[in-house]
Swiss-Prot record:
Name recorded for this polypeptide: Ras-related protein Rab-27B
Protein activity control: Regulated by guanine nucleotide exchange factors (GEFs) which promote the exchange of bound GDP for free GTP, GTPase activating proteins (GAPs) which increase the GTP hydrolysis activity, and GDP dissociation inhibitors which inhibit the dissociation of the nucleotide from the GTPase. Activated by GEFs such as DENND10.
Annotated binding of GTP, by residue: 16-24, 74-78, 133-136, 163-165
Basic and acidic residues: compositionally biased ranges: 206-218
Sequence positions bearing Cysteine methyl ester: 218
Gene Ontology, cellular component aspect: apical plasma membrane; axon cytoplasm; Golgi apparatus; Golgi stack; late endosome; melanosome; multivesicular body membrane; synaptic vesicle membrane
Compartments where located: Membrane; Late endosome
Source organism of the structure: Mus musculus (Mouse)
Length: 218
């Protein structure tokens, strides 16, 4: 895909405490590489990737394929950058909420991040995937899978255990979030059937005629 050659622009935001591995996770997803020497993110950074999203018909058959430009925003986890980070919440269409499987404190802080999300996101129930990162370090693990799954079930969101080092579930977790977002937009379009004018967007249904950045009420 060339610049501008896409149907949808989707912005995702990676959230979580400093040191949980957000930067290495996103780098693994966009470049399929692992760099353990990244320095702590200061403020906001982002990476990009183009993907093809295949829709499914009611009968389960493959539908139309859409070209999606993903912007993956990487946020600083430190408290001093919190006001800057929350300013980006309303622009994001989905969230990768991450904690470190080797840090119980980062897991406990997921609740604080959820509170900030619910207060600052574009709606009260945005699309979120909970991610327990550093699954490649089982000997250092402090958070068991049952704890994490129970928390994800409480919030009604998917949960994945990932590793930026090995690539485990990195792509799958982002694909799951994208699928949630695209299905939300499709339902929104079906309900409204009104022309979308955002960024010269689509004609009220997922027809992929022009690049569009869409949001939908929760």
């Amino acid at each position: 895909m060339t610049d501008g050659d896409y149907d949808y622009l989707i912005k995702l935001l990676a959230l979580g405490d400093s040191g949980v591995g957000k930067t290495t996770f996103l780098y693994r997803y966009t470049d399929n590489k692992f760099n353990p020497k990244f320095i702590t993110t200061v403020g906001i950074d982002f990476r990009e990737k183009r993907v093809v999203y295949d829709t499914q018909g009611a009968d389960g058959a493959s539908g139309k394929a859409f070209k999606v430009h993903l912007q993956l925003w990487d946020t600083a986890g430190q408290e001093r950058f919190r006001s800057l980070t929350t300013a980006f919440f309303r622009d994001a269409m989905g969230f990768l909420l991450m904690f470190d499987l080797t840090s119980q404190q980062s897991f406990l802080n997921v609740r604080n991040w959820m509170s900030q999300l619910q207060a600052n996101a574009y709606c009260e129930n945005p699309d979120i995937v909970l991610i327990g990162n550093k699954a490649d370090l089982p000997d250092q693990r402090e958070v068991n899978e049952r704890q994490a799954r129970e928390l994800a079930e409480k919030y009604g969101i998917p949960y994945f255990e990932t590793s930026a080092a090995t690539g485990q579930n990195v792509e799958k977790s982002v694909e799951t979030l994208l699928d949630l977002i695209m299905k939300r937009m499709e339902k929104c379009v079906e309900k409204t059937q009104v022309p979308d004018t955002v960024n010269g967007g689509n004609s009220g249904k997922l027809d992929g005629e022009k690049p569009a950045e869409k949001k939908c009420a929760c």
